[in-house]
Amino acid sequence: MKSLSIKDIAVKAGVSITTVSFIINGKARDKSISEAVIKKVEKIIVESGYKPNQIARSLRTGNSNIIGLIVEDISNSFFSKIARLIEDKAYKKGYKIIYSSTENHIEKAKELITMFKSRKVDGYIISPIKGLEEDIQQLMADNKPVILFDRNLPDLDANYVGADHFKATYHSIESFIKQGKKKISLVTIDIDVQQITERLTAYKKALADYDIPYEENLVLKVHFNQDEKETMVQMEKLFQTEEIDAVLFATNYLAISGLKVLKQTGKKIGNDFSVIAYDDHEVFELHTPGISAVQQPLEEIAETVIQLILSQLSSKTKLDNQHIILPAKLIER
């Protein structure tokens, strides 16, 4: 059966097209339309299967009820989990999420922002990369709510939600030191983004505070997006040539690759060799022995991001930007 048009619904309900439009766009109570009429029209809408054209609706109301989510890599477990949480929370508030990955390519990131603009999204949730400052500044100048998360852009005054990467990393290295470890390695990636640089800074600070010399040869910086086999070759060389007694992997996918290398080389995790992964993963709990991991507060990050962007969307005046840092915790296994 062909679904009804907005005109058909108005005729069937015995009301004007304008009244039906107000009800569909959530403005019925602002226009003092009675509850009886609202329920009558809503019943006809449900029974007819009527679905408003989203683009036409956004042109009429100025709102699309769509939020754009831009992340580094949606296949990464951290981003996929947080995207799902954001999507669920947004849906409960009447918003849909469309998302895509930058893969840390600045041109792709700029193209995504342009694409989301053409989709008339109401706001943006972005895990940014350097070089996007002007684009994000322009979004805010256009009165579009923008929430940055996971990594910040220090030169940009914008809303930001993230975990305390420095403190979580410091505590991880400190836990190694308290176990008597002296040759502590950091396996990280070579991209200049806030959360990665903070982990390296915290690593160096913890060593210095406990009078352990920083040795550059104990830090492996893996190229972002390089083939896993090449990464594993680099890790194997590091583990075999240095007398390492502990290693912090700066991401969970690096840790998973590292566990494969340790298995291949026969290096045992235990009293003589300890491992911590940044960002927890199901693999670490299932592994024998269990792998300690830094757990970011994904639920709190998602909830805070949604609360911030919804408050921005509903406010008739510009709100002050907020920087919210949430604690991460070390899960010892």
Model-derived segments and spans:
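Central regulatory/effector-binding core of bacterial HTH transcription factors
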Residues: 88-133
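Flexible loop/turn connectors
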Residues: 232-333
